[in-house]
Amino acid sequence: MATMDLSSDLVEEILSRVPARSLVRLRSTCKQWEALIAEPRFVNKHLSHMRYREQQFTVFNNEHIVSPLFGSTTSYVGIDFNKPENCGVKLPFPIALSPAINISHCDGLLLYVTKSMLLVANPLLSQKRWIKCSEGFDHSMDAYGLGYLFNQSSGFYDYKVVRFRCGIKNSSRVEVYAFKSDSWKVVVDTNFGGFDGLPLSSVCLRGTPYWLGYNKSGNELMSIQSFDFSKERFEPLFLPPQSIGSRNLVKYISLGIFRGDQLSLLLECHETCKLHLWVMKKQHWSRLMTVDVPQDAIYGKYFSSFIERNGRLALLIKSRNISIYIGGENQEFKRFEYFTGLGPMLSDCCYIQSLLQIPGFSR
Protein backbone atom coordinates (compact mmCIF):
# COMPACT_ATOMS: atom_id res chain seq x y z
CA MET A 1 0.00 0.00 0.00
CA ALA A 2 1.37 3.40 -0.95
CA THR A 3 2.23 5.79 1.86
CA MET A 4 0.82 9.30 1.94
CA ASP A 5 3.24 12.23 2.17
CA LEU A 6 2.18 14.73 4.78
CA SER A 7 3.03 18.41 4.65
CA SER A 8 5.68 19.64 7.07
CA ASP A 9 3.11 21.88 8.79
CA LEU A 10 0.77 18.94 9.39
CA VAL A 11 3.61 16.76 10.69
CA GLU A 12 4.59 19.54 13.10
CA GLU A 13 1.00 19.95 14.28
CA ILE A 14 0.67 16.21 14.92
CA LEU A 15 4.00 15.91 16.74
CA SER A 16 3.24 18.97 18.88
CA ARG A 17 0.39 16.99 20.45
CA VAL A 18 2.41 13.83 21.17
CA PRO A 19 3.50 13.37 24.83
CA ALA A 20 7.08 14.46 25.53
CA ARG A 21 8.21 11.01 26.64
CA SER A 22 7.07 9.50 23.33
CA LEU A 23 8.80 12.24 21.32
CA VAL A 24 12.10 11.50 23.06
CA ARG A 25 11.84 7.92 21.82
CA LEU A 26 10.72 8.97 18.32
CA ARG A 27 13.40 11.57 17.62
CA SER A 28 16.03 8.94 16.76
CA THR A 29 13.82 7.38 14.05
CA CYS A 30 13.92 10.36 11.66
CA LYS A 31 16.56 13.09 11.24
CA GLN A 32 13.94 15.65 10.21
CA TRP A 33 11.89 14.90 13.32
CA GLU A 34 14.99 15.08 15.50
CA ALA A 35 15.82 18.54 14.12
CA LEU A 36 12.23 19.73 14.52
CA ILE A 37 11.90 18.46 18.09
CA ALA A 38 15.05 20.38 19.08
CA GLU A 39 13.83 23.72 17.67
CA PRO A 40 12.94 26.22 20.46
CA ARG A 41 9.86 27.32 18.51
CA PHE A 42 8.55 23.74 18.39
CA VAL A 43 9.45 23.12 22.04
CA ASN A 44 7.36 26.13 23.12
CA LYS A 45 4.46 25.09 20.89
CA HIS A 46 4.58 21.55 22.26
CA LEU A 47 4.72 22.79 25.84
CA SER A 48 1.66 25.01 25.30
CA HIS A 49 -0.33 21.91 24.29
CA MET A 50 1.06 19.67 27.04
CA ARG A 51 0.22 22.07 29.87
CA TYR A 52 -3.39 20.98 29.42
CA ARG A 53 -2.90 17.32 28.46
CA GLU A 54 0.40 15.97 29.75
CA GLN A 55 0.61 13.64 32.71
CA GLN A 56 1.60 15.50 35.86
CA PHE A 57 4.05 14.28 38.44
CA THR A 58 4.72 15.12 42.03
CA VAL A 59 8.46 15.17 42.64
CA PHE A 60 9.65 14.40 46.12
CA ASN A 61 12.91 13.70 47.88
CA ASN A 62 13.02 10.56 50.02
CA GLU A 63 15.42 10.93 52.92
CA HIS A 64 15.75 7.17 53.44
CA ILE A 65 17.45 6.62 50.09
CA VAL A 66 20.25 9.12 50.51
CA SER A 67 23.66 7.46 50.49
CA PRO A 68 27.27 8.72 50.44
CA LEU A 69 27.89 6.70 47.26
CA PHE A 70 24.92 7.74 45.13
CA GLY A 71 23.87 10.99 46.79
CA SER A 72 20.17 11.80 46.82
CA THR A 73 17.61 10.00 44.69
CA THR A 74 14.46 11.81 43.63
CA SER A 75 11.25 9.86 43.10
CA TYR A 76 8.24 10.73 40.96
CA VAL A 77 4.59 9.85 41.48
CA GLY A 78 2.56 9.97 38.26
CA ILE A 79 -1.14 10.72 38.13
CA ASP A 80 -3.32 9.16 35.43
CA PHE A 81 -7.00 9.80 36.13
CA ASN A 82 -8.13 7.35 33.46
CA LYS A 83 -6.37 4.49 35.25
CA PRO A 84 -5.97 5.65 38.85
CA GLU A 85 -5.32 2.14 40.12
CA ASN A 86 -2.15 2.08 38.01
CA CYS A 87 -1.10 5.70 38.34
CA GLY A 88 1.92 5.18 40.59
CA VAL A 89 5.11 5.68 38.60
CA LYS A 90 8.47 5.61 40.35
CA LEU A 91 11.31 7.01 38.25
CA PRO A 92 14.61 7.47 40.11
CA PHE A 93 16.74 10.44 39.13
CA PRO A 94 20.11 10.33 40.95
CA ILE A 95 21.61 13.60 42.08
CA ALA A 96 25.20 13.73 43.20
CA LEU A 97 26.40 15.40 46.38
CA SER A 98 23.98 16.37 49.14
CA PRO A 99 20.18 15.84 49.09
CA ALA A 100 17.82 18.51 47.83
CA ILE A 101 16.43 20.75 50.57
CA ASN A 102 13.88 22.31 48.25
CA ILE A 103 12.55 21.56 44.75
CA SER A 104 10.68 23.92 42.41
CA HIS A 105 9.50 23.65 38.81
CA CYS A 106 9.13 25.72 35.64
CA ASP A 107 8.07 24.26 32.27
CA GLY A 108 9.72 20.87 32.73
CA LEU A 109 12.85 22.21 34.43
CA LEU A 110 13.45 21.42 38.09
CA LEU A 111 15.45 23.61 40.46
CA TYR A 112 17.05 21.69 43.33
CA VAL A 113 18.45 23.55 46.33
CA THR A 114 21.18 21.60 48.12
CA LYS A 115 23.26 22.61 51.14
CA SER A 116 26.01 24.08 49.00
CA MET A 117 24.81 24.62 45.41
CA LEU A 118 21.82 24.80 43.09
CA LEU A 119 21.02 22.26 40.39
CA VAL A 120 18.76 22.82 37.38
CA ALA A 121 17.70 19.61 35.65
CA ASN A 122 15.44 18.22 32.96
CA PRO A 123 15.06 14.56 34.01
CA LEU A 124 13.35 13.59 30.75
CA LEU A 125 16.32 14.76 28.65
CA SER A 126 18.90 13.67 31.28
CA GLN A 127 20.27 17.21 31.39
CA LYS A 128 21.55 19.05 34.44
CA ARG A 129 23.48 22.22 35.20
CA TRP A 130 25.03 23.23 38.50
CA ILE A 131 24.82 26.84 39.65
CA LYS A 132 27.33 28.23 42.11
CA CYS A 133 25.66 30.21 44.88
CA SER A 134 26.65 33.75 45.62
CA GLU A 135 28.23 34.90 48.86
CA GLY A 136 26.00 34.66 51.91
CA PHE A 137 24.13 31.56 50.70
CA ASP A 138 21.90 30.10 53.45
CA HIS A 139 19.76 27.15 52.34
CA SER A 140 17.82 27.18 55.62
CA MET A 141 16.47 30.73 55.17
CA ASP A 142 16.64 31.44 51.42
CA ALA A 143 13.62 31.00 49.12
CA TYR A 144 13.96 30.47 45.37
CA GLY A 145 11.95 30.77 42.18
CA LEU A 146 12.73 29.59 38.65
CA GLY A 147 11.18 31.54 35.77
CA TYR A 148 11.81 33.56 32.64
CA LEU A 149 11.11 36.70 30.64
CA PHE A 150 10.65 37.09 26.90
CA ASN A 151 13.63 38.62 25.10
CA GLN A 152 12.25 40.87 22.37
CA SER A 153 15.54 41.10 20.45
CA SER A 154 16.24 37.35 20.26
CA GLY A 155 12.65 36.16 20.20
CA PHE A 156 13.40 33.56 22.89
CA TYR A 157 12.95 33.25 26.64
CA ASP A 158 15.71 34.21 29.08
CA TYR A 159 15.58 31.89 32.08
CA LYS A 160 16.46 33.22 35.50
CA VAL A 161 16.46 32.31 39.20
CA VAL A 162 15.39 34.68 41.96
CA ARG A 163 16.53 34.20 45.54
CA PHE A 164 15.42 36.11 48.63
CA ARG A 165 16.13 35.87 52.35
CA CYS A 166 13.31 35.03 54.77
CA GLY A 167 12.96 35.38 58.53
CA ILE A 168 11.86 38.09 60.94
CA LYS A 169 15.41 39.02 61.93
CA ASN A 170 16.81 38.92 58.39
CA SER A 171 16.77 41.67 55.79
CA SER A 172 14.85 40.70 52.64
CA ARG A 173 17.93 40.56 50.41
CA VAL A 174 16.96 39.81 46.78
CA GLU A 175 19.26 38.41 44.07
CA VAL A 176 18.66 37.32 40.48
CA TYR A 177 20.71 34.76 38.57
CA ALA A 178 20.81 34.89 34.74
CA PHE A 179 21.59 31.67 32.87
CA LYS A 180 22.84 33.69 29.89
CA SER A 181 25.58 35.51 31.82
CA ASP A 182 26.06 32.82 34.49
CA SER A 183 26.08 35.50 37.19
CA TRP A 184 24.13 36.83 40.19
CA LYS A 185 23.16 40.44 40.83
CA VAL A 186 21.55 42.16 43.80
CA VAL A 187 18.10 43.67 43.21
CA VAL A 188 16.71 46.49 45.36
CA ASP A 189 12.96 46.33 46.03
CA THR A 190 11.96 48.63 48.87
CA ASN A 191 8.28 47.64 48.64
CA PHE A 192 8.89 43.95 49.39
CA GLY A 193 8.35 43.26 53.09
CA GLY A 194 9.29 39.58 53.00
CA PHE A 195 8.08 36.48 54.84
CA ASP A 196 8.67 35.58 58.49
CA GLY A 197 9.90 32.13 57.41
CA LEU A 198 10.30 30.02 54.30
CA PRO A 199 7.20 30.09 52.05
CA LEU A 200 4.49 27.51 52.68
CA SER A 201 4.08 26.87 48.97
CA SER A 202 5.33 28.05 45.57
CA VAL A 203 4.51 27.59 41.87
CA CYS A 204 5.53 29.08 38.53
CA LEU A 205 2.92 30.26 36.02
CA ARG A 206 3.93 31.45 32.54
CA GLY A 207 7.46 32.23 33.72
CA THR A 208 6.40 34.10 36.86
CA PRO A 209 7.12 32.47 40.24
CA TYR A 210 4.58 32.81 43.07
CA TRP A 211 5.04 32.19 46.80
CA LEU A 212 2.56 31.87 49.65
CA GLY A 213 3.72 32.65 53.16
CA TYR A 214 3.20 34.53 56.42
CA ASN A 215 4.08 38.21 56.42
CA LYS A 216 7.12 39.43 58.30
CA SER A 217 5.06 42.23 59.90
CA GLY A 218 4.17 40.02 62.88
CA ASN A 219 0.40 40.10 62.37
CA GLU A 220 0.38 36.39 61.39
CA LEU A 221 -1.42 37.17 58.13
CA MET A 222 -0.65 35.38 54.88
CA SER A 223 0.07 36.85 51.48
CA ILE A 224 0.93 35.78 47.94
CA GLN A 225 3.95 37.40 46.30
CA SER A 226 5.05 37.09 42.67
CA PHE A 227 8.29 38.22 41.07
CA ASP A 228 8.31 40.04 37.73
CA PHE A 229 11.67 39.34 36.07
CA SER A 230 11.19 42.13 33.52
CA LYS A 231 10.66 44.77 36.23
CA GLU A 232 12.84 42.96 38.79
CA ARG A 233 10.42 43.53 41.61
CA PHE A 234 7.86 41.69 43.73
CA GLU A 235 4.15 42.17 43.22
CA PRO A 236 1.55 41.16 45.86
CA LEU A 237 -1.60 39.25 45.01
CA PHE A 238 -4.67 39.37 47.23
CA LEU A 239 -6.06 36.19 48.80
CA PRO A 240 -9.64 34.84 48.72
CA PRO A 241 -11.76 36.10 51.67
CA GLN A 242 -11.80 32.75 53.50
CA SER A 243 -8.02 32.54 53.57
CA ILE A 244 -7.47 35.99 55.09
CA GLY A 245 -6.82 35.36 58.74
CA SER A 246 -4.35 34.11 61.30
CA ARG A 247 -2.58 30.77 61.47
CA ASN A 248 -5.34 29.43 63.75
CA LEU A 249 -8.07 29.79 61.10
CA VAL A 250 -6.43 27.84 58.28
CA LYS A 251 -5.25 24.27 58.82
CA TYR A 252 -3.70 23.78 55.40
CA ILE A 253 -3.15 26.01 52.37
CA SER A 254 -1.24 25.54 49.14
CA LEU A 255 -0.77 27.12 45.71
CA GLY A 256 -1.33 25.20 42.48
CA ILE A 257 -1.80 25.57 38.72
CA PHE A 258 -5.26 24.85 37.30
CA ARG A 259 -5.33 23.35 33.80
CA GLY A 260 -2.03 24.82 32.83
CA ASP A 261 -2.79 28.54 32.81
CA GLN A 262 -4.56 29.65 36.00
CA LEU A 263 -3.37 30.11 39.55
CA SER A 264 -5.23 28.00 42.11
CA LEU A 265 -5.37 27.81 45.89
CA LEU A 266 -6.39 24.86 48.06
CA LEU A 267 -7.19 25.51 51.71
CA GLU A 268 -8.67 23.60 54.62
CA CYS A 269 -10.53 25.45 57.37
CA HIS A 270 -9.92 24.46 61.00
CA GLU A 271 -13.58 24.86 62.02
CA THR A 272 -15.35 23.07 59.15
CA CYS A 273 -12.66 20.56 58.08
CA LYS A 274 -13.69 21.27 54.49
CA LEU A 275 -11.38 21.73 51.54
CA HIS A 276 -12.00 24.75 49.30
CA LEU A 277 -10.45 25.03 45.86
CA TRP A 278 -10.15 28.56 44.46
CA VAL A 279 -9.10 29.54 40.94
CA MET A 280 -7.88 32.96 39.81
CA LYS A 281 -9.82 34.23 36.78
CA LYS A 282 -9.14 37.69 35.37
CA GLN A 283 -7.60 38.93 38.62
CA HIS A 284 -10.50 37.62 40.73
CA TRP A 285 -10.74 34.49 42.84
CA SER A 286 -13.60 32.10 42.11
CA ARG A 287 -14.40 29.16 44.38
CA LEU A 288 -14.48 26.12 42.14
CA MET A 289 -15.11 23.30 44.58
CA THR A 290 -15.80 22.51 48.25
CA VAL A 291 -15.35 18.95 49.54
CA ASP A 292 -15.14 17.18 52.88
CA VAL A 293 -11.69 16.04 53.92
CA PRO A 294 -11.38 12.22 53.60
CA GLN A 295 -11.72 10.82 57.12
CA ASP A 296 -8.62 8.65 56.98
CA ALA A 297 -6.58 11.58 55.63
CA ILE A 298 -7.28 14.12 58.37
CA TYR A 299 -3.85 13.73 59.97
CA GLY A 300 -1.86 13.50 56.75
CA LYS A 301 0.04 16.16 54.88
CA TYR A 302 -1.19 17.33 51.48
CA PHE A 303 1.65 17.47 49.01
CA SER A 304 -0.12 18.80 45.95
CA SER A 305 -3.48 19.04 44.24
CA PHE A 306 -4.86 19.64 40.80
CA ILE A 307 -8.02 19.15 38.78
CA GLU A 308 -8.63 16.82 35.88
CA ARG A 309 -11.05 17.75 33.11
CA ASN A 310 -14.04 15.93 34.59
CA GLY A 311 -13.86 18.01 37.76
CA ARG A 312 -12.21 15.57 40.13
CA LEU A 313 -9.80 16.70 42.82
CA ALA A 314 -6.60 14.74 43.36
CA LEU A 315 -4.84 14.92 46.73
CA LEU A 316 -1.44 13.44 47.44
CA ILE A 317 -1.17 12.81 51.15
CA LYS A 318 1.84 11.68 53.17
CA SER A 319 1.53 9.97 56.52
CA ARG A 320 3.41 6.67 56.85
CA ASN A 321 3.22 6.26 53.08
CA ILE A 322 2.11 8.10 49.96
CA SER A 323 -1.63 7.93 49.23
CA ILE A 324 -3.60 9.43 46.37
CA TYR A 325 -7.22 10.47 46.95
CA ILE A 326 -9.48 11.21 43.99
CA GLY A 327 -12.99 12.60 44.40
CA GLY A 328 -15.36 15.48 43.79
CA GLU A 329 -18.15 17.53 45.35
CA ASN A 330 -20.81 14.85 44.84
CA GLN A 331 -18.69 11.74 45.18
CA GLU A 332 -16.67 10.04 47.88
CA PHE A 333 -12.90 10.03 47.68
CA LYS A 334 -11.25 6.86 46.49
CA ARG A 335 -7.88 6.02 47.95
CA PHE A 336 -4.91 4.56 46.09
CA GLU A 337 -1.79 3.76 48.11
CA TYR A 338 1.80 3.83 46.90
CA PHE A 339 5.34 3.56 48.15
CA THR A 340 4.82 2.35 51.72
CA GLY A 341 7.61 2.66 54.23
CA LEU A 342 9.12 5.85 52.84
CA GLY A 343 11.16 8.14 55.02
CA PRO A 344 10.64 11.86 55.66
CA MET A 345 10.14 13.97 52.55
CA LEU A 346 12.49 16.91 52.25
CA SER A 347 10.60 18.74 49.52
CA ASP A 348 8.09 18.30 46.70
CA CYS A 349 6.58 20.08 43.71
CA CYS A 350 4.30 19.46 40.73
CA TYR A 351 6.10 18.74 37.50
CA ILE A 352 5.21 18.38 33.81
CA GLN A 353 7.65 16.70 31.43
CA SER A 354 8.89 18.86 28.55
CA LEU A 355 11.48 18.99 25.77
CA LEU A 356 12.93 22.26 27.05
CA GLN A 357 16.73 22.31 26.92
CA ILE A 358 18.56 23.69 29.92
CA PRO A 359 20.07 27.06 28.91
CA GLY A 360 23.82 26.68 28.51
CA PHE A 361 23.72 22.90 28.83
CA SER A 362 26.64 20.98 27.31
CA ARG A 363 27.50 17.31 27.67
UniProtKB/Swiss-Prot annotation:
The keyword Phosphoprotein appears for this protein: no
Name used for this protein in its record: Putative F-box/LRR-repeat/kelch-repeat protein At1g11620
Domain F-box residue range list: 1-50
InterPro entries referenced in this protein's UniProt entry, alphabetically: F-box-assoc_dom_typ1, F-box-assoc_interact_dom, F-box-like_dom_sf, F-box_dom, SCF_F-box_component
Xref: SMART domains: FBOX
PANTHER family assigned: BNACNNG10540D PROTEIN, F-BOX PROTEIN CPR30-LIKE
LRR repeat ranges per the UniProt record: 221-246
Pfam families membership: F-box, FBA_1
Kelch repeat coordinates: 158-207, 209-254
UniProt KW keywords: Kelch repeat, Leucine-rich repeat, Repeat
Taxonomic lineage from the root: Eukaryota, Viridiplantae, Streptophyta, Embryophyta, Tracheophyta
Gene3D superfamilies: 1.20.1280.50
